[in-house]
Amino acid sequence: MKDKIIYDFSYSSTKINEKETRRNDFIKITNNKNISAMSKIVKPNKKIVEIKKDEINNTETLIVNSETSFILKKLGMKQVTQKTIMLFDFLTEELLANNSYKQVKNIDPKVSFSLEYYAELFGRKFDSKYVRTALRKELTEEFSRFQSMKIVIKKEDGGEVSLSLASGYNTSGKTMSINLDIDLVRMILNSPLTILPKTSFLDNENYELSKKLSTHYHLDGNIKKGNNNILSVKTLLEASGTKIPSYDDVMSSNRAWKKRIVNKLDEILNKISKQQGIEWEYCLAKKEPLEVQIKDIKTYDDFLKLYVKYEYKND
C-alpha cells in the first residue's frame, strides 16, 4: 500500500479537521520527462462544486472535485491563486538548472533569477522604477505565501510527514532567490516534472490547458503508446476550468452551446497554437479525420465524443 498524500495549503497557524487524500503517489518515469509537480497539489481553476465551512476553526474547505481540495482561512488569508501555481511550476523547473532528476547528493534547494528575467518570462513590463517596485512586491508576497504553506504526507503506519514549501527568501537587489525546503526538493527531483514551453507562462488565462497539452505530449508512457498527441474534447474542456462554461450553465441561459463552448475552445486552442507553435485539428478516437465539419456537429454529446490531434512544430 502506498502512502497517502494530503496537499494541505492552509497557513501553518490554521487547525485543520478536514482533508482530502490522494491514493496515488508520484509515478516513476524515465528520461527526465515528468509531469508538473504543482498539478499534483492543487487545481483551483476547476469549478467549485461545494464549500464546507468550519466556523469553530475559522476555515473553509473548497471542494473542487472528488480528489482535490484546498483549505483557506476564512478571514484574512490570501488564496492560492493561478499566479501562485504558475510561479511554483516555474520554480520547480528552475531547480533543474542546478540539480538533476533522481539526484541524491549535493542538492541545491536555492532558486535564483533576475527580476528582469521574471518579467520577460511572465509577459510583464519592465520599463520603469514603479513597475520594477511592483514586481518586487508581488514576488515578496508570493514567496511569503510559499513560506507559510505545507504538504502533509500520511504514512501507512498512521504517522505523517509535514513538508514546508520554503525556508527563506530574498527579494532585494538584482537577484531574486528562494530556498525551497530540502525535503520538498528531494521529492520534486524524484517526481514527475515536465519542462513546459517557456511561452506557457505568458498566458495566465489558459495556463492549465496549455500545461495539460504539454505534459500529455511529452510523457514517456504516452509516447510509447503512441497517444501522446491526442486528447479527448472532454479532457480539454475539463482542463479549461471556468474559462469555458458547462453545458448545464449554457442550457439554463441562452442555450447557444456551439458559440459558448465549441467556439470558445477553438479560440483558446488557436491562441495556444500561436504562442507555442502547435498544429491541431479535431479528429475521431483513433485519429481518423472527421466525416463532417465541426460546425455541422448536431449535438453536444456528439461533440464530446470527438478528440483533438496536435503536434508541436518545433519539437
Q: Where does each model-flagged region fall?
A:
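Charged, alpha-helix-forming regions
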Residues: 1-315
